[in-house]
Structure formats: structure tokens, C-alpha cells
Amino acid sequence: MSSTTQAPGPVYQWTADEAVQFLKEWNFSLGIILLFITIILQFGYTSRSMFIYVVKMIILWLMWPLIIVLCMFNCVYALNNVYLGFSIVFTIVSVVMWIMYFVNSIRLFIRTGSWWSFNPETNNLMCIDMKGTVYVRPIIEDYHTLTATIIRGHFYMQGVKLGTGFSLSDLPAYVTVAKVSHLCTYKRAFLDKVDGVSGFAVYVKSKVGNYRLPSNKPSGADTVLLRI
């Protein structure tokens, strides 16, 4: 009994004309999408608009899963062994970095208890206690000094508005910046009043240690930290 094997069908490949035609049909839509993403990434800062910043974080958060899916797709439909090898390496690197992101974010969440720990842009979280309310916001760089400003009751930290109804007397003696591996404590070194309801304070980095913020902290206990 004889068996017949069917020859594999030809692999379809785009021609240059088809690629040009595809770009002509989708160029406008792709341009709008890329322009939108560029504007969000360019102007998405907490000091400008919290809504735009959150959208920026969502876009950055979706980048790694999208890259992993594309790398896996390249592994399945590799053009040759060279492309397959590079695709496997890129997939492994993407998955490892994605896992490292979650590990670091969970460690930072344990230290601060804030969902800002899952911010994909930075692992620096500034924490300040104002009248029993702890405000947590991400900061991009590792600053040696931090500036708190009160303008007619409006409270700003590093240029980011955090709340209203505060005075200079409400500013704490210490501010902390949480990182994955340690917690930096900043001590208030300078306080200046511009008028009766406005002024600013400068905090200088004074201590670094392996601490976490307590979940419940009594009023005025600015230096109470829990070692981990």
C-alpha cells in the first residue's frame, strides 16, 4: 500500500508594492496613534496633569507584555534559524525583565504599602506625613534635597500639588524616599516664611537604612520607622 505525501505549500511573502500599499492605507492611522503616544510620553508629568501621567503609566505598563507577545510570535514564525535564535534570546530577556519588574514592585509595595510601587517609570517613592495623612508620589531622580512649598494653603512637594488647607507649621521634621533596597530619610534643614500664609522648607538627606513605613503611626512621630 503506497502513501502519498503532499508537498508543503509556498510561503507567502510581501512584495515591495504591497508593503507600500499597506503604508499608504494605514499611514494616517499609525501617524495619529504614534503622535498620541509621543505627546503622552513627552508631557506626562505629575506636576502638569495627573490624568495624563496615569495614562502614560498605563502605556508604559503595557509595553512589556506587548514586546513579549511580539517576540513569541517571532519565535513561532521565524524566517530562518538566525531570526529564531535572536527571537528566543529577546523573548527570554523580556520575560526576565518583566519578572524583575514585578519582584521589585512587590518589594517596594511591602516597604510603603502604596500602589505607586507598581509605577513602571521609577522605583523612587517620596512619602510625607501631613497631619496624619501620608502622601506618596513617585519621583524620577535620587535627589540630595527635597523642597516643600506652601502657597496660601496649597501644599506642593517637588512642584507636585498634594493637597490644600495646610500651613507651614504642618510641615513635618522628616520626609522619606522609599526604594526597593532601602529607605532614605530627609531632615528639614531650612524653613523660610514668605508671608503669613506662604513659605517653603528644604529637606536634606540624612539617613539611609533598611526600613519600611509603619501602617499606623502616631501623630508627630516623624522618625518612627520599622526595620525589615
Curated annotation (Swiss-Prot):
A cellular component annotation (GO) from this entry: virion membrane
InterPro entries per UniProt: M_CoV, M_HCoV-like
Virion surface side: 2-25, 78-85
Location (main, coarse): virion
Assigned keywords, A-Z: Glycoprotein, Host Golgi apparatus, Host membrane, Host-virus interaction, Membrane, Transmembrane, Transmembrane helix, Viral envelope protein, Viral immunoevasion, Viral matrix protein, Virion
MF terms in GO: structural constituent of virion
Membrane keyword on record: yes
Localization per record: Virion membrane; Host Golgi apparatus membrane
Origin superkingdom: Viruses
Membrane protein topology class: Multi-pass membrane protein
Topological domains, Intravirion: 47-56, 107-228
Transmembrane stretches, start-end: 26-46, 57-77, 86-106
Function: Component of the viral envelope that plays a central role in virus morphogenesis and assembly via its interactions with other viral proteins.
Similarity comment: family membership: Belongs to the betacoronaviruses M protein family.
Subunit description: Homomultimer. Interacts with envelope E protein in the budding compartment of the host cell, which is located between endoplasmic reticulum and the Golgi complex. Forms a complex with HE and S proteins. Interacts with nucleocapsid N protein. This interaction probably participates in RNA packaging into the virus.
Protein's recorded name: Membrane protein
Lineage, uppermost ranks: Viruses, Riboviria, Orthornavirae, Pisuviricota, Pisoniviricetes
Gene: M
